[in-house]
């Protein structure tokens, strides 16, 4: 039984992390989101933080987001839920979008950052 569990653990550790290719959007303080508005995780929204919203990744997880148009990449922390627009998989803070070099929509690759 121990050997079976060990084999399963090794298989899981060797499983490559898959990229999610989709469209990213930027969301910022303004409109219905005022400075300090709490995100779904309870953390206040701040345009200057390297954060993002994702539909299913756990709060606090980190992802590497790469802009497919220019190759720029950034690591952000998931603190909110969304986006709720078909075809989009991640909403980036203004700081995250700025680091990727876009201000509206752009195609990206999203990969969870695995830490030991």
Model-derived segments and their meaning:
Residues 2-6, 14-116:
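Secreted/periplasmic proteins
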């Amino acid at each position: 039984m121990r050997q079976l569990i060990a084999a399963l653990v090794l298989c899981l550790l060797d499983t490559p992390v898959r990229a999610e290719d989709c469209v990213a959007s930027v969301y910022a303080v303004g409109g219905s989101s005022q400075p300090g508005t709490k995100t779904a995780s309870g953390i206040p929204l701040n345009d200057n933080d390297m954060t993002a919203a994702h539909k299913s990744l756990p709060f606090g997880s980190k992802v590497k987001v790469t802009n497919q148009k220019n190759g720029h990449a950034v690591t952000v922390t998931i603190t909110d839920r969304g986006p709720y627009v078909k075809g989009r998989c991640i909403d980036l803070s203004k700081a995250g979008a700025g680091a990727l070099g876009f201000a509206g929509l752009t195609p990206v690759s999203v990969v969870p950052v695995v830490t030991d």
